[in-house]
Structures are given as structure tokens and as C-alpha cells.
């Protein structure tokens, strides 16, 4: 066979696209203890990753599938090889019949060796050229992979910067929302104070109207007493005139008696009648003076007493009116200040709401741009990953081609070395079988339990129908605080405090008899061993170590008549 007639059978393997499927499967189940089960499937084997750790898993998946197909092809080739070996054995049996032809071939040994050498050198040059081209392509692919990795790192850095910016914006928004909540709470407090002041103003107005009515009644009483005084003065004048009339009558009678006495010539009779008349006159005068003095004294005393009462009532009414005027003036001033402050706070609240709207709009824009950049980066990353997978597959194919070529070169060398004996073909078959690579795949399942997070949500609500309110009910059941929101003391003796917990018994605390809660003060009721008994600021309930805890707790205050006066409810949920 001449050199020009020989053609090398070594060629570049045709490229083909392999479909890749991830071998890592994740399954999650939610257990009763709010835990999550994560199933991880790992792939192990002897696949070559060429040091590409970021894409090792995906490349291994592609190579595993290609190895599966190659294993199937290798099985078919093994079957073909087995049939070929049987054919070789048949040919070896025929070789015994072809010794004559072999002797002829041995006579032409030198010429045939030269032809085989030419064939070997031609194949070797082709293989070297192909290896050189493969090395060049591999270097180019490695450079491209480095550039892609650098670009991927840049995208990752930009992504981290965008995430940090989003975190900063989120923190600023949380701070603004916190300030807004504080301002809203302050506004609600001011509205509550204004409502309380308006109630106080209404109470003072009602008190003022009551005092004005009392003043009118007092004035009417003064006028009535004045009329009575005039009437009594008229009665006194009438009595005085009657006394004068009686005195004149008595004087006339005395004058008549004197005239009669003067007619009597007896000295003893004149003296007797004179003495009797003088005695009668003295008795009448003394009785008249006594009656007159008694009447005058009684009238003057009664008049002075009534005048003093009227003056006292008038002074008290004047003081109360002055106090009410001062209180109304002070409340109006405070109300004006509160309204001014409330207007300032409302303006500030509007400004903050405008800032929040601007920040929300800016945050939405940033989030949209951030999501768009994330989508673009994800698309770029997926594209780079696909390209990297393709490059890894092509690189693995080139490596496989190189290994196959190296194995074929070694086989040809051994074939030439073993041409002198009859076992050369058998060695060829054995080398082909020995160079077949076997890939094993094993699956490892690992069960990992991730403890879930627990979120607690609590809500409180309270109400009051009078001046006594339940200010606080400690969640762990250590104490309960009652508050007197009025400006006067409240007697809450024999009142009952009931605490109902879902699924548990009811706890009842009764206040001591004649217990008074002072104005604008509070009293704390401790469970046994949780505080100090110091009335009227604190009381201790000796019958219970705790007022109880639960997810649904209602605390209610009842007066002596069993009426609901205040309540406090607490509800908690856990997710």
C-alpha cells in the first residue's frame, strides 16, 4: 500500500447538544412542630470538572447524561466486539490453513514494514495536529471562561451594592414610619386631652348654671325676706299704735277713776284708789314693756339671722362664680394652646405624610429598577451558565477525544510491537476493552430539619363606663392596675375584679370595704408573693399566686350592684 493511497481514520468527533437535567432534587414537608424537611440528592462519581467549581454541579449533570448514553453505546460496541472476537477466533482457525500465504508474506517482510511505518507516521502527524488544535481551542475557551467569571463577579458585586442600597432605604422608611407613629400617638393623646377638657368645661358650665339658679333662688329668698320684714314692721307699727290706743284708753280710765276718786271725800279712799291705780298702771306698763321688748328682740334676731344667711350665701356664690370664671378662662387658654399645637402637629403630619409618599414613590421606582436589574442580571447569569455548560461539555468532549486519541496511539504502537506474534490482534482487543471507562452514579439522601421561626402577635383593648378604668393587666398575671381618671375620689369598696381565661377557672378579687381610690391616682393589685401590701397605692391578693395567663384573657370590674364598669381584654396568637 503506497503513502498516497492511505487516509487517516482519525477525525474530530461531531459536536452535538446534550439535554441537561439537574440531579439535585429538593422536597420540603411541613411537620407539626413548624419544621421543614429538606431532601438533598447529591451526585458522586469519577466525572471530570476541570476545576470549574461554580458550574461543577451543572457540568456533572450534563456529563452524567452523556456518560449514560456513552455507556449504552459502549454496551453496543462491546456486543459488536464480542462478535468480532468470535470472528477473529474463526479467522485464527483458518490461519492454520494459510501457513503458505504467511510464508510468502514473511518473504516480503521489509516492504510491508515500510508501508506500516508510513501509515503510523501519517496517523501520528494527524493526531499531533489535532491535539495542537485542541490545545489552542482549550486555551481560548479557558480565557473566555475567565472573562465570563470576572463579568459574573462584577454583576454579583453590583447586585450586593443594590441590595445594600435597598436595605438603607428600607431602614430610612422604617425610621420615618416610627416617627409618624409617634406623632399620631401624640395627636391622639392631645385629642383625648381636648375631649377631657371639653367635658370639664361642660361640667363647669352646668355647675355655673346651677350656681346661677341658686343665686336666683337666694335673691328671691332675700326679696321674700324683705317683704316679710316690711310686713313685720307694719305689724310692729300696728302693735305700737294698738299699744298707744290701749294706753290712751287706760289713761282715760285712770282719769275717770281719778275724777271718781276726787269726788270721794274720804282721805283713806283717795289713797287706796290712788295706790291701786298706780299699781295697775305699773303692771300694765311693765307688761307692755315686756311684750314690746320681747317682740322687738325676736324680730331683730330673726332679721339679723336672715340677713347674715343671705350675705353668707351671696359671698359663697360669688366665690364659686369667680372660681368657675377662672377655671373656664384657664381651660379656654389651655384649649387654645392645644388647638394651636394640634394645628402645628397636623401640619407637620401632612409634611411627613408627603415625605412618606415621596419616599414610597422613590422606593417603588428603586424597587422596579432593582427588580429590572435583577432580572437582567439573572438573564445574563443564566445565559452565562448555559454558555459555560456548553463550553464545559465541549471541553469534556475535547478531553475525551484527546484521551481516545492517546489510547489509539498506544494501541497502534502495541499493535506494531506485537505484529511478530499471533497474539497481536488479541492484545488489540484486550486494549480496547481495557480503555473502556466505567462511570458509576450513586445517590445519597440526607434528611435535614430546619427549625422554623415563631411569630407572636398580641392585641389589647380596654373600655370604661365611669371614672375607674383598668390601666394595665400584666400578661404573666403578676398584677393588675386600676386608675381613677376623674378629679374626685371614688369609693370602690366591695367592688369585684373578675379575670376570665379561656379553658381555665375564673379568678375574683374583692376590694376591701370603704376602700377609696383617690383622684388622678392608681392602685396596683399584686398576686401573692409578687408585691408589697401598701394601701391605698397597692394591694395583695393572698388567695392566688398569679392572676393567670392565656391566649384569650378578659379582666372585668364590677360595682356593688354587679354592673360592668370597666374591662380589659388580651388576645395572643402564635404562627
Curated annotation (Swiss-Prot):
Which family, according to the similarity comment?
A: Belongs to the intermediate filament family.
Q: Which organism is it from?
A: Caenorhabditis elegans
Tell me the protein's name. Answer: Intermediate filament protein ifa-4
Where is the stretch described as Linker 1? Answer: 106-119
Cellular compartment(s): Cytoplasm
Q: Which UniProt keywords apply?
A: Coiled coil, Cytoplasm, Intermediate filament
Classification via InterPro entries: IF_conserved, IF_rod_dom, Intermed_filament_ifa/ifb, Lamin_tail_dom, Lamin_tail_dom_sf
Q: Name one GO biological process term.
A: protein localization to nuclear envelope
Q: Where is this region: Coil 1A?
A: 74-105
Tissue and organ expression note: Expressed in the larva in the pharyngeal-intestinal valve, the rectum and some neurons of the tail. Highly expressed in the intestine of the newly formed dauer larva. Colocalizes with ifb-1. Not expressed in the intestine of normal developmental stages.
Organism placement in taxonomy: Eukaryota, Metazoa, Ecdysozoa, Nematoda, Chromadorea
Alphabetical list of PANTHER family matching this protein: INTERMEDIATE FILAMENT PROTEIN IFA-4, LAMIN DM0-RELATED
List, alphabetically, the PROSITE patterns matched.
IF_ROD_1, IF_ROD_2, LTD
Region Tail: which residues?
Answer: 424-572
Q: Does the keyword Coiled coil apply?
A: yes
Q: Where is the LTD domain?
A: 456-572
Q: Which residues form the IF rod domain?
A: 70-423
Map out region (Head) in residue numbers.
Answer: 1-73
Chain residue ranges for the region called Linker 12: 258-275
Function of this protein?
A: Cytoplasmic intermediate filaments provide mechanical strength to cells. Non-essential protein.
Locate the region Coil 1B.
120-257
Any one Gene Ontology molecular-function term assigned to this protein's record? structural constituent of cytoskeleton
Report residue spans for region: Coil 2.
Answer: 276-423
Task: Please give the superkingdom of this protein's source.
Answer: Eukaryota
Keyword Secreted assigned to the entry: answer is no
Q: Cite the record's note on assembly.
A: Probably forms some heteromeric filaments with ifb-1.
Q: Name any GO cellular component annotation.
A: nuclear lamina
